[in-house]
Amino acid sequence: MRGNIAQLMQQAQKMQENLQRAQEELAKLEVTGSAGGGMVSVTLTGAKECRKVRIDPSILSDQEMAEDLIAAAFNDASNKIDAESKDRMGSATAGMQLPPGMKLPF
């Protein structure tokens, strides 16, 4: 029984180290989302901080369209980060499923 507990503790520590490494990698990550066939692009960090917005000047005359495309590009980048985060955190936890509603990073 003690051997099993010690082994579980080692696995938990390794998983914690893997999660820390994955979180550090995600913090350095930059992802670009786009909309309108590339007329708008938004670059976010892994922490979803906006780094850059590029807008094709031809859409600036239509404010509503520009606003919609900026929001869509932001959402595209955000979804890409979510997918990358899920993939990296899944690898870090060795595929161990988290309870429903629990998200990483904690």
From Swiss-Prot:
Which GO terms of the cellular component aspect does the record hold? bacterial nucleoid; cytosol
Q: Keywords of this protein's UniProt record, alphabetized?
A: Cytoplasm, DNA-binding
* Gene3D superfamilies attached to this UniProt entry: Nucleoid-associated protein YbaB-like domain
Q: Which Pfam family is one of those matched by this entry?
A: YbaB_DNA_bd
This entry's Gene Ontology molecular function terms read:
DNA binding
Source organism per UniProt = Xanthomonas euvesicatoria pv. vesicatoria (strain 85-10)
State the compartments where it is located.
Cytoplasm, Nucleoid
Write out the function statement from the record: Binds to DNA and alters its conformation. May be involved in regulation of gene expression, nucleoid organization and DNA protection.
- Name the domain of life: Bacteria
This chain belongs to which protein, by name? Nucleoid-associated protein XCV1128
**SUPFAM superfamilies linked to this entry:** YbaB-like (SSF82607)
Instruction: Tell me the segments the record calls region Disordered.
Output: 81-106
Name the family the entry cites: Belongs to the YbaB/EbfC family.
Reply yes or no: does the keyword Transmembrane apply.
no
User: Subunit notes for this chain?
Assistant: Homodimer.
Q: Which HAMAP family match?
A: DNA_YbaB_EbfC (MF_00274)
